[in-house]
């Protein structure tokens, strides 16, 4: 039996029944990872994983710990003690952290078993899975390797969709977990800003960054938040808010109100997506929910991408100033200290990263701050106010997670058409407003998945999972992986 395609709950039940054990499961996962052709791995931790699995078997099962012995992969922008962490950038080659990220510490305490590090777009900047220093990461649902899996959490999505592990860690700054989840038939979740500690997560845009993860069903996503949520004094932005038992949600939408945004839901072009999206709304209403179309100022929707882009370029320029070849990572020789920095950054960053840093530096120059950076901050505030106004009257915002199936690599372009930018980038609402947001599979088109997204009120993750579980029951697309029945 192939145990690695099972969910966390299913695998745990087999452990309890004595039908398999972590040693067997880890060996299966390692064998599948070695055979995988999707270029999803940055570094492996197989020896340590085998030792940990054997230790767990010798110690005996913890029946009340559902994460006991569950293998997973880590996006390579999380610090892993003693394991190279490059964030898929040449400039960080050779950097080996001396500490684990807080989320990894918590998962280790729960006896989950890390198998290795997953690929990403360089420094988590990008949405294609194309810009990492190891090249393209492929979508497991396309054996021809023509379709992208999305990014920046490309490898993390690919490894779960390929049926190698039940879950993986990612990070979400614009839609870097939730968009790949749509393309790969997965549940992709980001919590409220501050709900999960970011200690040990390499920063991209701190005012937008969130730890996220991929699972194959909604319950597993809620289960992980039970462990990962909560205050961490090492991360001063982590919240003191009380942690709920998220996996105890009741899958019910009776009396709940869903808003669809007119400027987005009315622009759906893909006929399969449109059909299934409308059907899901009808089914939600049958189950007692209210679903209504709401209008947000189109000018604010049109400003979503540009606002995100200006802010993210500016913050990332500042955050990555320490990558200078002096403190850690790769270093290029130079006659002077300035030459070392210049040569290191020139050789270490790709053209995409350099462009972002140039734009970020430009927007932060004193003479440009009011025109660009401050204006983007003001636009963000207006967007957040408009979204929160909607969520005052409604419990959730319900929208397609992507315009259609994963694009082909040769279709990737810098399409600056306003309608396209809104349709393709509206998930940044969750980051700009710091709201919990979840993507789950909605339909299959030409053998490729398309997801739907639900965004809720801040710190209302439990009800978000409850609503997502109902949508999951409507679509019937639970526990998807390549080769599963669709």
What are these regions (language model features)?
Residues 9-12, 27-30, 50, 54, ...:
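Predominant activation on well-ordered alpha-helical scaffold segments within soluble catalytic domains
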């Amino acid at each position: 039996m192939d145990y690695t395609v099972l969910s966390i709950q299913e695998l745990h039940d087999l452990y309890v029944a004595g039908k398999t054990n972590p040693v067997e499961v880890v060996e299966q996962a390692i064998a599948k990872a070695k055979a995988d052709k999707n270029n999803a791995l940055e570094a492996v931790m197989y020896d340590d994983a085998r030792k940990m699995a054997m230790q767990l078997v010798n110690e005996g099962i913890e029946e009340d710990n559902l994460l006991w012995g569950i293998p997973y992969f880590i996006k390579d922008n999380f610090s892993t003690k003693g394991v190279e962490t490059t964030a898929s950038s040449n400039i960080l080659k050779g950097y080996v952290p001396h500490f684990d990220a807080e989320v990894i510490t918590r998962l280790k305490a729960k006896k989950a078993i890390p198998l290795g590090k997953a690929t990403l777009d360089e420094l988590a900047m990008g949405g294609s899975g194309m810009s990492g220093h190891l090249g393209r990461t492929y979508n497991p649902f396309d054996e021809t390797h023509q379709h992208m899996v999305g990014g920046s959490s490309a490898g993390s999505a690919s490894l779960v969709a390929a049926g190698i592990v039940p879950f993986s860690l990612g990070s979400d700054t614009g839609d870097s977990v939730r968009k790949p989840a749509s393309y790969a038939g997965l549940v992709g979740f980001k919590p409220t800003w501050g709900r999960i500690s970011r200690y040990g997560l390499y920063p991209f845009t701190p005012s937008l960054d969130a730890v996220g993860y991929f699972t194959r069903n909604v319950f597993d996503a809620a289960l992980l938040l039970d462990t990962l949520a909560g205050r961490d004094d090492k991360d001063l932005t982590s919240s003191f808010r009380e942690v709920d038992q998220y996996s105890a949600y009741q899958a019910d939408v009776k009396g709940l109100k869903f808003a669809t945004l007119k400027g987005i839901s009315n622009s759906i072009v893909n006929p399969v997506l449109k059909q299934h999206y409308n059907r899901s709304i009808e089914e939600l209403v049958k189950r007692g929910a209210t679903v209504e179309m709401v209008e947000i100022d189109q000018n604010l929707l049109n400003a979503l991408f540009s606002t995100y882009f200006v802010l993210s370029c500016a913050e990332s320029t500042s955050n990555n100033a320490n990558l200078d070849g002096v403190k850690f990572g790769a270093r290029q020789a130079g006659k002077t200290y300035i030459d070392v920095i210049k040569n290191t950054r020139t050789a270490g960053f790709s053209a995409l990263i350099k462009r972002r840093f140039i734009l970020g530096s430009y927007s932060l120059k004193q003479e440009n701050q009011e025109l660009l950076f401050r204006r983007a901050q003001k636009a963000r505030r207006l967007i957040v106010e408009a979204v929160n106004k909607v969520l005052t009257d409604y419990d959730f915002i319900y929208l397609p997670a992507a315009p259609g199936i994963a694009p082909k690599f040769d279709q990737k372009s810098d399409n600056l058409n306003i309608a396209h930018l809104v349709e393709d980038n509206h998930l940044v609402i969750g980051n700009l407003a710091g709201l919990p947001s979840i993507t789950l599979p909605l339909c299959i088109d030409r053998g490729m998945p398309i997801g739907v997204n639900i965004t809720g009120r801040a710190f209302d993750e439990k009800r978000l999972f409850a609503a997502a579980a109902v949508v999951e029951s409507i679509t019937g697309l639970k526990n998807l992986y390549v080769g599963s029945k669709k």
